[in-house]
Amino acid sequence: MSYVHSLRVRYGECDMQRVVFNANYFVYVDDAVDMWTRHALSDELAKAGSSTDLHAIGFDFMLKTTQLTWHSPVKFGDTLDMHCEVSRWGNSSFDVAINGQVDGDSRFDAVITYVSVDPKSQRPSPIPDIVKEALSK
């Protein structure tokens, strides 16, 4: 499934050149994946009596690695569209590829590796099928 998360770049997220400060790209992609996950799992979360708590469905995930390749700047006032999709499924880890675009022009590519963890022990655990299904639609 490809999910698009959009945001407008605010002044406080930029440096003196009025371009996004480099660390904020990582905040943006993490937020995009969080929004996508909760959107894709919204029916399962509702059945479990929650709208946001992934623990209610027996799932949580933590970042292992992030890689970002910058192509051109994202600037103050731009609307940034982040196209997210799972690019690799493992047993307990998965990769999410994100392409950041402004007006259809690619500004960066990121790949994040996440590890599925048991919410109680926070130890790696197999990715639940409901998560794989939801993020693969």
Which stretches of residues belong to each language-model region?
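Terminal targeting signals and extreme-terminal segments of soluble enzymes
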Residues: 1-81, 87-137
